[in-house]
């Protein structure tokens, strides 16, 4: 940061109110109309020196002049936060004023000021500068910038996010500072230009039409200088970018950087590229869209918007293979049908019918063809030999004439066709019947299942609780099981006892005693499976008054622990018909 000297180093400019500073040596850093960028390198607080009064006064004047020069910048109480974004505006102010002067004599060249009022000029840093890599701004404002028009991204101004305290390019050194708004711009939107023109993508604005001159309105061929190339790049490809003049003036052998909208993956959907504009670039200016650099990631499949909209060429029909080129039976049959049907020559009777038919129809009131043919047949047989000989002679001449006209004709042709049609019809009918029978057989085989007679097992202990379907096999009630959580539920073998075992509680208790070790291992599994699968027989627990005395009192041979665990299962497994009877 330039240090301020002891005395006044600079004076405010005329109308602009710009300040000029001086170093300790007293050398001027620039003219009176230039601004001095003050930048804090590491964020340390400035230590007050001995000559605080004069230095603080000079600093206050410079700060006030800078605030007056900046647009839409609110003053802050924190001087550190107010000075930090200031060099970015100063650094962009210089090249903007410089290019404003350069653009006046070059109104007909690359940069036109009034043609695109909705899209401001974009500051592109000179990538050949040695100060592009990580680090602060180049000292002394030696960094050069290149302006570009950016009509390829259209986002309404209401959808953009503006930040009045956007960081300087020094803090964005790890990113590509491709587009920087001159005054305020959110760091997350480096590729959006701010426009107040609200138009739908379906109807592009008039300043994007390449066929009409925006000044004269006369259709003209587009000029390559009026369409700015677009420049979406990843941060890792900064070192591989050539001089920016290569984008504006494409030369042979110099790569250009153009990625399709599908390859430009940005986390914010507002930055999506207009597909119509990208297709406009690729279709009308193919020399400006060259293959991408090998270091850049490219998508394997081209986006449909990038493909040049030339006239669609239908793919040529593939050459027919010999199998396809051979005449199929259908085509042969059609050709045979197209051939004219050659009738056989008329015999003597047919010639007589042809001659006498009109007379018979006029004499008779019958209109049926069969009746007329019968009448003609009777008349033919009534004729004498001489009269019939005349028609036989006519028939012979008819055959000779037919043989001259159709020398290769044979009567088998017509009859063969009829027989062939009949055979094809019969074959088609038999094939259809076979297909119907096969389909019906397949459906019948799928629907039918082998019937296996279900026989209950002989051993009652191996049969499931639901095999007999009687009331004796129903599980215990859940209410009785909940009454004593310490007592295990009735197990598989206890619930499946036949009538002879369930009528004797003593024998039932002895069976439970002998199988206690085996039942304890299966108690939990059978309890969970049977309680959820079968409905209980009793809806409420039985009162103790209806229980027999022999069931309520356990035999003296049982230990106390066995009585606690086995008494309730014995009571739970008794059906209602057996519990109400008294024990013998």
From Swiss-Prot:
DNA-binding region, residue range(s): 342-410
PROSITE patterns, per database record: HMG_BOX_2
GO molecular function, one term: beta-catenin binding
Any one of the GO CC terms: nucleus
Chain positions covered by the region annotation CTNNB1-binding: 1-71
Bias-annotated ranges (Polar residues): 492-501
Expression (tissue specificity): Detected in the basal layer of epidermis and in outer root sheath and bulge of hair follicles.
Principal place of residence: nucleus
SUPFAM superfamilies for the chain: HMG-box
Subunit structure: Binds the armadillo repeat of CTNNB1 and forms a stable complex. Interacts with DAZAP2.
Name the record gives this protein: Transcription factor 7-like 1
Organism: Mus musculus
């Amino acid at each position: 940061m330039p240090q301020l000297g002891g005395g006044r180093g600079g004076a405010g400019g005329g109308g602009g109110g710009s300040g000029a500073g001086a170093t300790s040596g007293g050398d001027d850093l620039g003219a009176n109309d230039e601004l001095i960028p003050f930048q804090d390198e590491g964020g340390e607080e400035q230590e007050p020196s001995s000559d605080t009064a004069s230095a603080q006064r000079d600093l206050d004047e410079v700060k006030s002049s800078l605030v007056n020069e900046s647009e839409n910048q609110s003053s802050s109480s924190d001087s550190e936060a107010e000075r930090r974004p200031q060099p970015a505006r100063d650094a962009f102010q210089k090249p903007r004023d410089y290019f404003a002067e350069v653009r006046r004599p070059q109104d007909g060249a690359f940069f036109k000021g009034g043609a695109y009022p909705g899209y401001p000029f974009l500051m592109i840093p000179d990538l050949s500068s040695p100060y592009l890599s990580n680090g602060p701004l180049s000292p002394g404002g030696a960094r050069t910038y290149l302006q570009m028009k950016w009509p390829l991204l259209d986002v309404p101004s209401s959808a953009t996010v503006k930040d009045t305290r956007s960081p300087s390019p020094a803090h964005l050194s790890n990113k590509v500072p491709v587009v920087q708004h001159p005054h305020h711009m959110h760091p997350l939107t480096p590729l959006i230009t701010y426009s107040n023109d609200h138009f739908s993508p379906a109807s592009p604005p008039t300043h994007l039409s390449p066929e009409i001159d925006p000044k004269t309105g006369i259709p003209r061929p587009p000029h390559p200088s009026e369409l700015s190339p677009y420049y979406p790049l990843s941060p890792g490809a900064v070192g591989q970018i050539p001089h920016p003049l290569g984008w504006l003036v494409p030369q042979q052998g110099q790569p250009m950087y153009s990625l399709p909208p599908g390859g430009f993956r940005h986390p914010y959907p507002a930055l999506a590229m207009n597909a119509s504009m990208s297709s406009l670039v690729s279709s009308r200016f193919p020399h400006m869209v060259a293959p991408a650099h090998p270091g850049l990631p490219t998508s394997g499949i081209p986006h449909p918007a990038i493909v040049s909209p030339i006239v669609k060429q239908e793919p040529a029909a593939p050459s027919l293979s010999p199998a396809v080129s051979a005449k199929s039976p259908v085509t042969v049959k059609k050709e045979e049908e197209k051939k004219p049907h050659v009738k056989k020559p008329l015999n003597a009777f047919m010639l007589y019918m042809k001659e006498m038919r009109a007379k018979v129809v006029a004499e008779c009131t019958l209109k049926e063809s069969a009746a007329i043919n019968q009448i003609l047949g009777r008349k033919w047989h009534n004729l004498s030999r001489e009269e019939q000989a005349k028609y036989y002679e006519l028939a012979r001449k008819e055959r000779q004439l037919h043989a001259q006209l159709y020398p290769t004709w044979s009567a088998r042709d017509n009859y063969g066709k009829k027989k062939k049609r009949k055979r094809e019809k019969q074959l088609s009918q038999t094939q259809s019947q076979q297909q119907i029978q096969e389909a019906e057989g397949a459906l019948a085989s799928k629907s039918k299942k082998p019937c296996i007679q279900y026989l209950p097992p002989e051993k009652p202990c191996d049969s499931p609780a639901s095999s007999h379907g009687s009331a004796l096999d129903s599980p215990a009630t859940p209410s009785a099981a909940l009454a004593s959580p310490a007592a295990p539920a009735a197990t598989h073998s206890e619930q499946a006892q036949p009538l002879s075992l369930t009528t004797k509680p003593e024998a039932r208790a002895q069976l439970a005693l002998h199988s206690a070790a085996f039942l304890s291992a299966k108690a939990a599994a059978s309890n969970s499976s049977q309680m959820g699968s079968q409905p209980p027989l009793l809806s409420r627990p039985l009162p103790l008054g209806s229980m027999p005395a022999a069931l309520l009192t356990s035999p003296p041979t049982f230990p106390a622990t066995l009585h606690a665990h086995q008494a309730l299962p014995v009571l739970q497994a008794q059906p209602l018909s057996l519990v109400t009877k008294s024990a013998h």
